[in-house]
Amino acid sequence: MANEGLVIRGISVTEELYDLLLFLTHSFVRPTTTELYSIKHIDVTVGENPKRLILTIRKGKTGYRTSNTMPAAVSVYERICERYSNFQAEDYIFLPNYQNRTTASKIIQRQFNELLNRESLELDPQTGKKHMLYSLRHTAICMRIINSEGKVNIFNLAKNAGTSVDQIERFYAKYLPLSAEMARNLQSFGE
């Protein structure tokens, strides 16, 4: 969409949409004005060993927290820093030219909806529910559980995502596919 010069309601679609979608799927943050759209450069620290971003979420749904990302979020942040090379510590990392964060959020939501429409992905084929940016938070949490083959510490994942183990069980884990690793985990007697 960015390569074709698409304009939605007077705003050009740029590579920033791609980076924001990747960031969401590798950071566990909520796509809200108090989480994703409120992150400033001062709230981001690049960590090593393991490679990650350490995000300070100041006014998230569950209050203040620090959160680790997956390694892929680091390269996204590096591209953001290159794109806005003259950034200041107090600048927002996404759509920094829009001080009104509700406006920034709506711009991305419109672009994301157009992407879903173009790819005929408006609805989840299994649940029948409408896809939205928030779906990418679900994807991030579920990918972590699946890719760890069930070995991720669910309490740690919940704390990092600013949610609870109960919420993960009720809204995320119930949609996960069964796997051989899950069966081995269920049948194990410890090591």
Q: Model-predicted segments: where are they?
A:
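Short basic/aromatic active-site micro-motif
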Residues: 14-19, 101-106, 124-147, 161
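C-terminal catalytic core of Y-nucleophile DNA break-rejoin enzymes
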Residues: 59-79, 89-115, 132
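Short, polar N-cap/turn motifs at the start of nucleic acid-interacting alpha helices
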Residues: 42-50, 150-171
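Basic, Lys/Arg- and aromatic-enriched nucleic-acid-binding interface segment
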Residues: 1-32
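C-terminal catalytic core of tyrosine-transesterase DNA break-rejoin enzymes
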Residues: 22, 26, 31-33, 135-163, ...
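Catalytic-site neighborhood detector that most strongly recognizes the C-terminal catalytic loop/helix
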Residues: 57-63, 100, 159-186
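Conserved tyrosine-mediated DNA breakage-rejoining catalytic core shared by Y-recombinases
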Residues: 1-6, 37-79
